[in-house]
Amino acid sequence: MNNRQITTLWSTLLVEALIRQGVDFFCISPGSRSTPLTIAAARNPRARTKLFADERSAAFFALGYARATEMVAPLICTSGTAVANYFPAVVEASMDFQPMLIISADRPFELLECGANQTIRQEHIFGSYTRWSMQLPTPSVEVPLTSLLSTVEYAVAKALNTPAGVVHLNQPFREPFEPESVAANNHAWWQSAQQWLASKAAHTTTTVEKKHPNNASITLLRQHLTTAKQPLLIAGSMRCKDDAEAVAALANNLKIPLYADFSSGLRMKSNLPPLQLLMQSPAWRAAFHPDVVLHFGGNVVAKHLATALREWQPAHYMVVREEPMRFSPDHNVTHRLEASIAATAHALHNSRSTPLWRESEADHFFAQAAQELEGDVVADQPITEISAARLISRHIGTEQALFVSNSMAVRDMDMYAASLHEAGIPTAINRGASGIDGILSTAAGFACGHGKSTTLLIGDIAFLHDLNALSLLGSLTVPLQIVLLNNNGGGIFSFLPIAACDDLFETYFATPQHYSIPLAAETFGLHYANPTTNSEFVAAYHQAQQSPQSTIIEVKSSRTNNLQHHRLLNARLQAIAAKLFNG
């Protein structure tokens, strides 16, 4: 067997090993050094592939796909800076425990650090942001076939299982790269390869059991819940819908208020009142004052909760999550349980039986708050950033998914969304590192993974940051409805103290852009709408939902007016709470 034949068969086996682990969607960026891997994926009848000119976009797409499916979509790229472009998405995936598998082609040993073209040190390039990385050998019949198979299968297991995250396989190849089939022969390596290919079975199957809480931990949590004067449940970021549903069921069983963050997937679920609206009220925080807080999952979007926890200083602040990483941003967690969220929540049912705290006042508040918010979506009123978020939450279909960008978009959805969907809506954000990069790409991957028409709420700076990702949408099998909140700059900075620095603010922080969104839509073959009223927005949104083609709905706003709108609305909501909860 010559080198070309060995490389072809090696790459075929590598891809087939992935397929037999349930991995069947590959994100490929064109390149010469990665030719053997690309051809192996393209020729495998069970592999699905998508091509990306930009590796950064590819990695964020794979991240979105993982958020939807809890499965890796292997990234294949050539050598050099191609692999480095994965880094932003690698950080996000690692920080938010999302599975990702990178297979980067590389130069062989003899071309490293000798001035060879397009050659960098790729092994361990992602540092501490990987769960595992491995430098694979250059394809050779001297390497036992079983070692290649078990390495690939272990890579998938490390990416998927707790703590899920990024795995990097760095695969060097020697030229030539073009495929060459191998005729039947007596070579032991070739024969073992054929036997494995014919077997149709995985070489290794990994089973990882859920971390179920032990009796002592459950007894402790139940005791704190039973004796609490006023408990509070928090649903932070979660990967699994079953976990989120279990936490919601626990809150209902125990009649304990539940703070359901947008990242939990519960925020728009019916029968879960948005505690976000109360959390910003000093009157409510002073009156409520929980002594026991049970926090499931990870972080939350709004700062109001952290402010409240600092004020309350609960005697017991307990966190339940599977990942073995520290989670205590304010260093106030008193007990941490590494266990299945769903199993823990189920085990805590019937811990207490007391009526909801000041249920009548809370019901009155949420009824009046809903009236205030509905006043913002009156048909003939101008469309605003707040009303756009609320109208999406009201009109998104049960068969759709929702992705929301960081910065103001997720804050508005977390705060002002309507809670109307009995079964909930598949939702996601990139909240691991909370960047605004790669949002369009991630949303496209999220839509692809779900196989559902997906709405994206995004600001103009995040939109421009990932503009080239619009090129992906034409080949998606499901459309995106991109609701673009365009306040001509970084609107969130208007809410920060730096806004008072008149000499610097506009140039260095607001950073206004003056690009034509309609021309961008035309360039990439997308539909475009620019509604000016709430009724026009609803009509444009409904039309986009019914279209097989992706649409950009541009909502133009003023940063100054948006800031004032938020302040006035929040002041009215706080006034309602003050009347009900003062004294």
Curated annotation (Swiss-Prot):
Its cofactor is Mg(2+); Mn(2+); thiamine diphosphate. GO terms for molecular function: 2-succinyl-5-enolpyruvyl-6-hydroxy-3-cyclohexene-1-carboxylic-acid synthase activity; magnesium ion binding; manganese ion binding; thiamine pyrophosphate binding. One of its GO terms (biological process) is menaquinone biosynthetic process. Binds 1 thiamine pyrophosphate per subunit. Pathway: Quinol/quinone metabolism; 1,4-dihydroxy-2-naphthoate biosynthesis; 1,4-dihydroxy-2-naphthoate from chorismate: step 2/7; Quinol/quinone metabolism; menaquinone biosynthesis. InterPro entries: DHS-like_NAD/FAD-binding_dom (IPR029035), MenaQ_synth_MenD (IPR004433), MenD_middle (IPR032264), THDP-binding (IPR029061), Thiamin_PyroP_enz_TPP-bd_dom (IPR012001), TPP_enzyme_TPP-bd (IPR011766). The keyword Transferase applies. It catalyses: isochorismate + 2-oxoglutarate + H(+) = 5-enolpyruvoyl-6-hydroxy-2-succinyl-cyclohex-3-ene-1-carboxylate + CO2. The keyword DNA damage does not apply. Its EC number is 2.2.1.9. CDD domains: TPP_PYR_MenD (cd07037), TPP_SHCHC_synthase (cd02009). It is an enzyme of class 2 (transferase). Pfam families: TPP_enzyme_C (PF02775), TPP_enzyme_M_2 (PF16582), TPP_enzyme_N (PF02776). Keywords: Magnesium, Manganese, Menaquinone biosynthesis, Metal-binding, Thiamine pyrophosphate, Transferase. It comes from the Bacteria. Belongs to the TPP enzyme family. MenD subfamily. Homodimer. Catalyzes the thiamine diphosphate-dependent decarboxylation of 2-oxoglutarate and the subsequent addition of the resulting succinic semialdehyde-thiamine pyrophosphate anion to isochorismate to yield 2-succinyl-5-enolpyruvyl-6-hydroxy-3-cyclohexene-1-carboxylate (SEPHCHC). This is 2-succinyl-5-enolpyruvyl-6-hydroxy-3-cyclohexene-1-carboxylate synthase. It comes from Chlorobium chlorochromatii (strain CaD3). The lineage of its organism: Bacteria, Pseudomonadati, Chlorobiota, Chlorobiia, Chlorobiales.
